[in-house]
Amino acid sequence: MSDLLEIRDVHKSFGAVKALDGVSMEINKGEVVALLGDNGAGKSTLIKIISGYHKPDRGDLVFEGKKVIFNSPNDARSLGIETIYQDLALIPDLPIYYNIFLAREVTNKIFLNKKKMMEESKKLLDSLQIRIPDINMKVENLSGGQRQAVAVARAVYFSAKMILMDEPTAALSVVEARKVLELARNLKKKGLGVLIITHNIIQGYEVADRIYVLDRGKIIFHKKKEETNVEEITEVMTSFALGKVNLGEKR
């Protein structure tokens, strides 16, 4: 595996509040990385820096070996970084194929090429092993897991190299959550880098190749999956939450 994104000593404050305090981590091509942390850990701020909504006060982002500065989400997207937020940014009363091509519709000179969009959507969903019976279905009729899948498919079609998934299993049933985690594995097989941001330790451990834990703006834990287990990660997160561990004892 080779480095896709490297985050080097990133700091970010909002007034007197230090959201990120020297965060360093990396995401490689063809791997799933889980970033775990409770509310207020700094996960959302880090996502917004990677996706171009915020600039770091200090530190660097290195994408495919080159330092990058994002002035907007479009800058991140142009390099192949796609972010899938909890709201998914889908239009409920439009069909699946239209949502996949939303704002980037295929046209035939003047008119929309519905046939082409439908064919490409079906081919894409099949390639990602996403099983939806009819691409003409409106998004409002899909389950939560299927909606996640449509949002991911849209990102992949437009040449994503890295997918950020923000709490992708929140409010999903156990069965639907497993389907979303399997989708992340399929993205890994296609050579993409996947960063899953979650507070669910079990799901994060299950799907990830490597696990980071963020607490009050600092990375307090980083190990490969085979080097740790759910119990250790839970102990670390609980100990820091209760103030039983000094930051100098980072694992």
Swiss-Prot record:
Its EC number is 7.5.2.13. It is an enzyme of class 7 (translocase). Belongs to the ABC transporter superfamily. PANTHER family: CARBOHYDRATE TRANSPORT ATP-BINDING PROTEIN MG119-RELATED, SUGAR ABC TRANSPORTER ATP-BINDING PROTEIN. This is Xylose/arabinose import ATP-binding protein XylG. The complex is composed of two ATP-binding proteins (XylG), two transmembrane proteins (XylH) and a solute-binding protein (XylF). CDD domains: ABC_Carb_Monos_I. The keyword DNA-binding does not apply. Induction: Up-regulated in the presence of D-xylose, L-arabinose and D-arabinose. Disruption phenotype: Deletion of the gene results in a growth defect on D-xylose and L-arabinose. Part of the ABC transporter complex XylFGH involved in the uptake of xylose and arabinose. Responsible for energy coupling to the transport system.
